[in-house]
Amino acid sequence: MAEQDYYDILGVSKDASEKDIKRAYRRLAAKYHPDVNHEPGAEEKFKKINEAYETLSDSQKRAQYDQFGSAGPQGAGGQGFGGFGGGQAYSNFGGGFDDIFSQFFGGGGRTRRDPTAPRQGRDLQYAMTLDFMDAVFGKTTTIKYDRDAECKTCHGTGAKPGKSPITCPRCHGAGVITSVRQTPLGNMQTQTTCPECNGTGKIIKPEDRCDTCHGAGHVHERHELEVKVPAGVDDGQQMRLQHQGDAGENGGPAGDLYIVFRVTPSREFRRDGSTIYVDRDISFAQAALGDEVKVKTVHGDVNLKIPAGTQSETNFRLRGKGVPHLNGNGNGDEHVTVHVKTPKSLNKRQREAMLAFAAASGEDVKGVKKTVLDKLRDAFEDK
């Protein structure tokens, strides 16, 4: 099933301004907030709205989404490019569901975050080193990294199978301890997070705690994941793998994994985006007379025609011989710069040929030390 477009989810056009996106998000979040809308599917709709807003409200993530979409350049679900950033899917205004809700409907100030509300897990980052050619053409590889995963025994509840958390006896489920003290200005009421339940309003009896996670609801694990690196990635780019980060809380989704690519430089090629640059030495004769020479490209050797009279530092473009574009639309180009090399020493025949060339060109090359044979030839020619 195809992923719904983020712009469609928020009901805005692709050229919508940040204000338009924020306005649409507020309107839809208020409509589908779980505390307001109890219809089937409303909570799932609310999650999609938050996911769409999280991407479109961030200029870097939005730019990457516009180019690659939510599925990423290779079309695999849940992969895409974007800047690394922490945060939670439900905290776009600095708080949880209740913070957002209070901004829509007032309430006399900032409300306390609901400790039982679903919260997205922490995002993780993984640095992947790639050989130059693997970055150009892509590869499939397996990575291993540490993450907090939902406990499979208790499915995140923290309690043994058949057991459930109970209402905190200290705060009676409120999650906070309320105290009133007298001041010169009158009675002042304060609230502090309940130390017994850490603000959740629920506790698990020691004897009821899950034997696997000991009541945490998640376990630390070494996770193995197959990653398809798309052709055309570059050094410093990042790819997001959705829901491959730390486990969420209270039924919230897992965080994302951001893979940062580190590409090893090539000894033969220089790269700028999808363009490849190479140097090719040619001789004076090849430059003057023209020739056809072999040139290295990332796609293999190709023949390059050198026109007669080519000057040193001349640049030739080989269309389509560069790096594949990330969007899958063809390849970049390769630029070949030729360098005419002057020989450091000449054998006898080469020297004679060069002197003859100079003479035929009407050049009197100063500083050329003549051999005995040259002097005899000059003597006979003078007679």
Swiss-Prot record:
CDD domains: DnaJ, DnaJ_C, DnaJ_zf
GO terms under biological process: chaperone cofactor-dependent protein refolding; DNA replication; protein refolding; response to heat
GO cellular component, one term: cytoplasm
InterPro entries: DnaJ, DnaJ_C, DnaJ_domain, DnaJ_domain_CS, HSP40/DnaJ_pept-bd, HSP_DnaJ_Cys-rich_dom, HSP_DnaJ_Cys-rich_dom_sf, J_dom_sf
Cofactor (UniProt): Zn(2+)
Subcellular localization(s) per the UniProt record: Cytoplasm
GO MF: ATP binding; heat shock protein binding; unfolded protein binding; zinc ion binding
Keyword match Zinc: yes
UniProt keyword annotations, A-Z: Chaperone, Cytoplasm, DNA replication, Metal-binding, Repeat, Stress response, Zinc, Zinc-finger
Start and end residues, zinc fingers (CR-type): 138-222
Top-level taxonomic group: Bacteria
CXXCXGXG motif repeats: 151-158, 168-175, 194-201, 210-217
Record's cofactor remark: Binds 2 Zn(2+) ions per monomer.
Residues reported to bind Zn(2+) 1: 151, 154, 210, 213
Sites where the protein binds Zn(2+) 2: 168, 171, 194, 197
Database matches in Pfam families: DnaJ (PF00226), DnaJ_C (PF01556), DnaJ_CXXCXGXG (PF00684)
J domain boundaries: 5-69
Family, per entry: Belongs to the DnaJ family.
HAMAP family hit by this protein: DnaJ
Domain notes: The J domain is necessary and sufficient to stimulate DnaK ATPase activity. Zinc center 1 plays an important role in the autonomous, DnaK-independent chaperone activity of DnaJ. Zinc center 2 is essential for interaction with DnaK and for DnaJ activity.
Function: Participates actively in the response to hyperosmotic and heat shock by preventing the aggregation of stress-denatured proteins and by disaggregating proteins, also in an autonomous, DnaK-independent fashion. Unfolded proteins bind initially to DnaJ; upon interaction with the DnaJ-bound protein, DnaK hydrolyzes its bound ATP, resulting in the formation of a stable complex. GrpE releases ADP from DnaK; ATP binding to DnaK triggers the release of the substrate protein, thus completing the reaction cycle.
Assembly information from the UniProt record: Homodimer.
Protein name: Chaperone protein DnaJ
Organism in which the protein naturally occurs: Limosilactobacillus reuteri (strain DSM 20016) (Lactobacillus reuteri)
